[in-house]
Amino acid sequence: MNSFPWLTTIVVLPIFAGSLIFLFPHRGNKVIRWYTICISMIELLLMTYVFFYHFQPDDPLIQLVEDYKWINFFDFHWRLGIDGLSIGPILLTGFITTLATLAAWPVTRNSQLFHFLMLAMYSAQIGLFSSRDLLLFFIMWELELIPVYLLLSMWGGKKRLYSATKFILYTAGGSIFLLMGVLGVGLYGSNEPTLNLETLVNQSYPVALEIIFYIGFFIAFAVKLPIIPLHTWLPDTHGEAHYSTCMLLAGILLKMGAYGLVRINMELLPHAHSIFSPWLMIIGTMQIIYAASTSPGQRNLKKRIAYSSVSHMGFIIIGISSITDTGLNGAILQIISHGFIGAALFFLAGTSYDRIRLVYLDEMGGIAIPMPKIFTLFSSFSMASLALPGMSGFIAELIVFFGLITSQKYLLIPKLLITFGMAIGMILTPIYLLSMSRQMFYGYKLFNISNSSFFDSGPRELFVSTSIFLPVIGIGVYPDLVLSLSVEKVEAILSNYFYR
């Protein structure tokens, strides 16, 4: 137990430092950009320091616990703590947000507000991943939505208001169910609300009530980690948002749904989860095939990448519903891996849009000749996304496969059918990714504009892309980097499932 409140510092620092941006003089955007990047870097370094020196990965209990009484009236605490499950997403958040602030250099309009919103999002995400109180979890979940809505509706594309409204309707509608679930779980069986996650893990419910709670939480998380048919906000949002916002959306926002699914639905409601997991398995397989076959029909480049990320979320659902150590570890690895790969793909799509000002794939072509570096990076990340061995996507999907096959819960025929479905999805993934690459970079289309406006990626773009590419290769070569953090915690979660 540390005396210094490390986690509170990590959560509060970005939004506190971001609110100082408005005190800056209005002279230049450069000061604001450098200030934001420095804050993100300091935050990332602080995070790594704390987790290196004060976190033991082989301990499945909650560490770095902080508990301050906040509202005496109904026993509401500011309660933070991390374990092996939340440390991966927290570090991913720090990494991706730092690179997204670096990717937002071209933003000049209202840059004070833009960078403040980026930092506010940073705080809310880390608060969500480290909160140990259900109501605090809900507050951070809601605090996330406001910056995304503003970033969408102010710095988006042509149809930005439509997609921002769609986003806020979907996610706020999901949050209603989340709030009802939080209140139901907290108020069950006592006059005093118990919101502490530690005590709620040991709470047992009647099966019917547990199923109702499970459905409520599941709808809220299914909107965020888009599970079909609640996924339609995602392609619109990604098609319109500025690409630094897209990096945050694809890298972290989608992972909040998966994290909530593991943290609340698996830990708090194990009986209902083992009842629902066959259906989840079917939904995940359907989602892999559906999104992978919808993706080639999209003209918009960003929408195509968005559908590919919906398809990759199917592997996370299958890993979570396999109820094995291997499957859940693979799902966590896929969370981290897709966080890197999705963010990089959206970043490269955005930078190439900045170069050529074309969104639709059938208008592009032949870009590989003037822009070889972007072509190389885009091809590499496409390979990582279609699970080439040696990259992180391959090892994550392989571990999910193993988890499904070794699962005690399912019979042989369902396992074979689901494996067959996953294999169909894995065949469709190279089809849309390689056709996307072909339509963008190959071909003979000569542009009407003069070639003077084409310059290859500068040092900033190269730095962002390579610094995302290194962890992808690193996790692919040595996946224990991520797995060693979560493996003890996964065993602790699955020890509740004694009737697997």
From Swiss-Prot:
Taxonomy of the source species: Eukaryota, Viridiplantae, Streptophyta, Embryophyta, Tracheophyta
Any single GO BP term: ATP synthesis coupled electron transport
Nuclease found in the keyword field: no
Chain segments annotated as coiled-coil in the UniProt record: none
Regions crossing the membrane: 4-24, 35-55, 87-107, 111-131, 134-154, 167-187, 208-228, 242-262, 272-292, 305-325, 330-350, 386-406, 416-436
Gene Ontology CC: one annotated term: chloroplast thylakoid membrane
Documented EC number(s): 7.1.1.-
Superkingdom, natural source: Eukaryota
Catalysed transformations (reactions): a plastoquinone + NADH + (n+1) H(+)(in) = a plastoquinol + NAD(+) + n H(+)(out); a plastoquinone + NADPH + (n+1) H(+)(in) = a plastoquinol + NADP(+) + n H(+)(out)
UniProt protein name: NAD(P)H-quinone oxidoreductase chain 4, chloroplastic
Source organism: Spinacia oleracea
Membrane topology category: Multi-pass membrane protein
Keyword hit for Transmembrane helix: yes
Enzyme category, top tier: translocase
Pfam family, one: Proton_antipo_M
InterPro entries documented for this protein: NADH_Q_OxRdtase_chain4, NADH_Q_OxRdtase_chainM/4, NADH_UbQ_OxRdtase, ND/Mrp_TM
Subcellular location: Plastid, Chloroplast thylakoid membrane
